[in-house]
């Protein structure tokens, strides 16, 4: 890795409709082939569907869903001697949010609904109610970390 200066963090501007950075970041993650307006349309539609079903503010629902997906621990490979250990480490706050968003989008795309809007709405609702594939992924990640707790002293 280069030992030069640290790369400056790009500032993501708040999203135009809800004025929220989390929504803007999620739009960027959903975006495919640079089609931002399509990604925005899909997310805004999903948030509308979800807010109608739950009768709450869309951004509040989204943030609660992401909180239910955020992992606290994960495992990282660490080579010691001739063997590789899966060492449990705490996840940085920024990475927690980023992983939660990526998992939300990934597992939304794997769903069987017809449109991307419906897929996203379904996954956000499931995460809000603490079920669904993205929440299961978080549980599996935590189980892996718990199972490898014996190697926690190899942390760096």
From Swiss-Prot:
Q: Which GO terms describe its cellular component?
A: small ribosomal subunit
Swiss-Prot/TrEMBL GO biological process terms: translation
The residues that cross the membrane are none
UniProt keyword annotation of rRNA-binding present:
yes
Q: Which residues form a coiled coil?
A: none
InterPro entries per the UniProt record, alphabetical: Ribosomal_uS7 (IPR000235), Ribosomal_uS7_bac/org-type (IPR005717), Ribosomal_uS7_dom (IPR023798), Ribosomal_uS7_dom_sf (IPR036823)
- Family matches, as CDD domains: uS7_Bacteria (cd14869)
State the source organism's domain of life. Bacteria
Entry's Pfam families? Answer: Ribosomal_S7
- Keyword annotations for this protein? Ribonucleoprotein, Ribosomal protein, RNA-binding, rRNA-binding, tRNA-binding
Citing just one GO molecular function, the answer is:
structural constituent of ribosome
- HAMAP family with a match to the protein in the record: Ribosomal_uS7_B
Function per UniProt: One of the primary rRNA binding proteins, it binds directly to 16S rRNA where it nucleates assembly of the head domain of the 30S subunit. Is located at the subunit interface close to the decoding center, probably blocks exit of the E-site tRNA.
Similarity comment text for this entry:
Belongs to the universal ribosomal protein uS7 family.
What is known about its subunit structure?
Part of the 30S ribosomal subunit. Contacts proteins S9 and S11.
Could you tell me what this protein is called?
Answer: Small ribosomal subunit protein uS7
């Amino acid at each position: 890795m280069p030992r030069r200066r640290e790369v400056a963090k790009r500032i993501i501007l708040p999203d135009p409709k809800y004025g929220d950075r989390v929504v803007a970041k999620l739009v960027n993650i959903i975006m495919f082939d640079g089609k931002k307006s399509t990604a925005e349309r899909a997310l805004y539609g999903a948030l509308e569907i979800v807010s109608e079903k739950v009768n709450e503010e869309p951004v509040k629902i989204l943030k609660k869903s992401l909180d239910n997906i955020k992992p606290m621990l994960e495992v990282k490979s660490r080579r010691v001697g001739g063997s590789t250990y899966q060492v449990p480490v705490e996840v940085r706050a920024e990475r927690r949010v980023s992983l939660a968003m990526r998992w939300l989008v990934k597992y939304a795309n794997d769903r069987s609904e017809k449109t991307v809007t419906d897929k996203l709405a379904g996954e956000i609702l499931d995460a809000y109610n603490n079920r669904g594939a993205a929440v299961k992924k978080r549980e599996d990640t935590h189980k892996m970390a718990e199972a490898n707790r014996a190697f926690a002293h190899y942390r760096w």
